[in-house]
Amino acid sequence: MKTLLFATSLVLAALPAFAQQNCDKPRDDFDGLYCLNKVYIETDAELNQAYKDLAPRLQAEGRARLKETQLAWIEERNAACSRRIDSGFYVNLSCATRSTRKRLEFLQERARECRSAGCQPSKL
């Protein structure tokens, strides 16, 4: 039992390295999907952090505007990058990642602006 547990833990420990290797050269569509999803999740986490970093720098009016534009952006991203069909739904992860990366860069630029010249809610 201890040997089996040890062997299982070795296999589980090797999975992240295996996944990274697969992302360098996906073997099939499922590997590619895994990698696209991984990149999207990482980009989305960065976006969430950028939002959390920017929001406290803004006055109440700016925070309200940020929330409003963020929700509008989410709707636009979803409309552009996903659709429902009879058998389920389709999400274009490349599109979602590009859109998320663009929004991330926008929020990071607004945060830099707040640090250097002061926050300008009209640019949100």
In which residue ranges do the predicted regions lie?
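N-terminal signal peptide c-region/cleavage motif recognized by signal peptidases
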Residues: A14-P16
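N-terminal alpha-helical modules
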Residues: F18-L124
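Short, linear, compositionally biased motifs with a strong N-terminal bias
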Residues: L10-V11
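Positively charged n-region of N-terminal signal peptides that target proteins for export
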Residues: M1-L4
